[in-house]
Design a protein with these regions (language model features):
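N-terminal export signals
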Residues: 1-29
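N-terminal small-domain helix-loop-helix segment of the aminotransferase-like
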Residues: 27-110, 117
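PLP-dependent aminotransferase class I/II
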Residues: 62, 237-321
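Short acidic capping loops at alpha-helix termini that bridge into adjacent secondary structure
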Residues: 101-105, 127-128, 207, 214, ...
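Conserved PLP-anchoring active-site segment centered on the Schiff-base-forming lysine
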Residues: 121-142
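Conserved PLP-binding catalytic core of the aspartate aminotransferase-like
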Residues: 155-157, 302-303, 312-346, 362
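Active-site pre-lysine segment of PLP-dependent enzymes
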Residues: 161-171, 184-210, 214-247, 263
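PLP-dependent enzyme catalytic core of the Aspartate aminotransferase-like
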Residues: 342-346, 351, 355-401
Length: 401
């Protein structure tokens, strides 16, 4: 049998056993970024399928980013610290866009790297993680992998984070993960509520860090919303994470960032992967950040398609949570797994299951209007097979308008 590098080193495969906290600690400050994965988690996707499962921008990067990518190939042989634009240029572009100084910004390979680093920085066997249920899973998965306790606080009946219960759970915690707008429920809390929450946690548990994930902030239309960046600048151990994977259409390029006080950002930098950006992604990101008109157009496009898709479900009699993102969370009264499988057989890919609401709710990402019209027909067909058409509706009215 051929000798592989893995067998030569005697290293177990990632699926063979979980990495223990002792193993991680023994590696010192190495960038421990492994995540458990299996082939089943990433099935082959048919080219013809409409992909409404991962909250991606269906149009991809804007024209400025595409032009920058083409020009950047001349520097593809350079490390991203030496290319032009460089990683330093990207930090400066983010700082200008957000209204902070470059020292208030740190970069990540998508915001996922930063979420995992936050758990490593602030969590421990005696300092638990607080998160909502359901919410984005990466922080709790990293905590479980490292043997850090997790306290999951159920969302309320409208899918909003229960800030009162989360504040109570935050006492003696290492880290609170606050996703606003929340994935998968798509709901948000206004600026005042977030500010009051931060002030309370800082008062009652001053050593607890607060991570406010704003991955979907570019899609928000609620006038009561405001970014938490000012809170991150005001308070130590409070920070905001964002990504260019959503509105900027750069999910495959893995560009994310965090904003906070310089000392807080230094903590992330100690855990960061060396060269956690590539020179092509840096060039595209800088160009995108300098093209705010493209993001405004993307927000308008998503708002129109989101409203259309909301009507598809409400016309069928289903409750849709108040979406402030590029996806919907819908009470379909049946399992997300079964709905996903029925849609997939018809060429529509929708979101994964989100415990503890996986028996009743599904997440559907927003594509183009054309994609949502086609998906609407399939959704009506799939749900119609499991629930009667609302009284007074004809079979024609079940088709999206």
């Amino acid at each position: 049998m051929p000798v592989s590098r893995r067998s030569f080193l005697g290293v177990p495969s990632p699926g063979a056993a979980a990495y223990s906290p002792a193993f991680v600690a023994a590696r010192g400050r190495e960038a421990f970024t492994a995540e458990p994965n299996s082939p089943a988690a990433a099935p082959t996707v048919p080219d013809a399928a409409i992909k409404l499962s991962s909250n991606e921008n269906p149009l991809g990067p804007g024209p400025a980013a595409m032009d920058a990518l083409t020009r950047a190939f001349v520097d593809a042989g350079r490390y991203p610290t030496n290319a032009r634009p460089s990683m330093g240029d990207l930090r400066a572009a983010i700082a200008r866009r957000v209204g902070v100084q470059p020292e208030n910004v740190t970069l990540g390979a998508g915001s996922g790297e930063l979420l995992r680093s936050a758990v490593r920085l602030y969590g421990s066997s005696s300092r638990h993680l607080v998160t909502a249920a359901p919410s984005f899973e990466q922080p709790e998965r990293m905590a479980e992998q490292l043997g850090i306790g997790v306290r999951r606080v159920p969302v309320d009946k409208d899918g909003r984070l229960d800030l009162e219960a989360m504040a109570q759970a935050a006492r003696w915690a290492g880290l609170v993960f606050l996703c606003n707008p929340n994935n998968p429920t798509s709901t948000l809390h206004p600026a005042r509520a977030v500010a009051e929450f931060v002030a309370r946690v800082r008062r009652e548990s001053p050593d607890t860090a607060i991570l406010i994930d704003e991955a979907y902030h570019d899609y928000v239309t609620d006038p009561g919303y405001a970014t938490a960046v000012p809170l991150a600048l005001e308070h130590p151990n409070v920070f905001v994470t964002r990504t260019l994977s959503k509105a900027y259409g750069m999910a495959g390029m893995r560009v994310g960032y965090a904003v906070g006080q310089p000392r807080t950002m230094d903590g992330f930098n100690r855990w960061a992967i060396t060269f956690n950006q590539n020179s092509l992604a840096v060039a595209a990101a800088v160009a995108s950040l300098e093209d705010p008109a493209h993001i405004e157009a993307e927000r308008a496009r998503n708002t129109e398609a989101r409203a259309f898709t909301t009507r598809v479900f409400t016309d069928l009699g289903y409750k849709v949570m108040d979406s402030q993102a590029n996806f919907l969370f819908v009470d379909i009264g049946r399992s997300a797994k079964g709905f996903k499988e029925d849609c997939a057989r018809r060429g529509i890919l929708v979101g994964r299951e989100f415990p503890p609401l996986e028996k009743t709710h599904t997440r559907v990402s927003i594509g183009t209007i054309d994609e949502m019209q086609k998906a609407g027909v399939v959704i009506a067909e799939v749900l119609g097979a499991h629930r009667p058409v609302p009284a007074g509706s004809s079979s024609d009215s079940r088709r999206p308008r």
